[in-house]
Amino acid sequence: MVRSRRTQIMLAVGATFLVILPQLIYWKVVTGSFVYDVGSKWDFLLPHFRVLFGWEKGWFIYTPITLLFIAGLFFMRRMPWRKSVLVFTMLNIWIVIAWHDWRYGGSYSTRALVQSYPVLALPFAALIRRVSVTRWRWPFFVLCGYLLFVNLFQIKQYNNTTLHFNGMNRAYYQAVYLDADPTEEDLRLLREED
């Protein structure tokens, strides 16, 4: 098959190189090297599960609808892409939580997992498909609405600097959960260690 599609494969490789070329040129001009090492490292044997559950930027805490993305992985039976989605999800999450600088800079939630959303839409759709034909569909859709509301409200809190970009802790998070106007007493909790 590779031999019969040699021209298409060469075109794809060339197009990929052209897409990457501006980044390589930028790195060469700015750093003097075509490949730039940011200086961090991987901790594959000691992954940082706080990426998923931590009060600082936990994916499931600040983007709670993603819990349903993961739940959908259990409802993909008989889907032709099931194995690909499972392998991608497990590898991608493991790679993201193994990065030494697990907070990924000042940002909202776990920005390093955003690129996974198109793939995770498949198990989420499988979950919706399965639940929508049961008596649990209305409670499920209410739950989806609530999780979406929490996510959007927290984005608003982040944009208003109620949620700190890098220094959140459990006590402060609980004090400002769905609270548009934190008090000075709440803000003092932000300075405490978790």
What residue ranges belong to the model's regions?
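Juxtamembrane/interfacial segments around transmembrane helices
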Residues: 59-71, 135-137, 165-171, 188-194
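Interfacial helix-loop-helix junctions of multi-pass membrane proteins
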Residues: 98-108
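Membrane-interface junctions at the ends of membrane-embedded or membrane-associated helices
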Residues: 1-8, 70, 74-81, 121-143
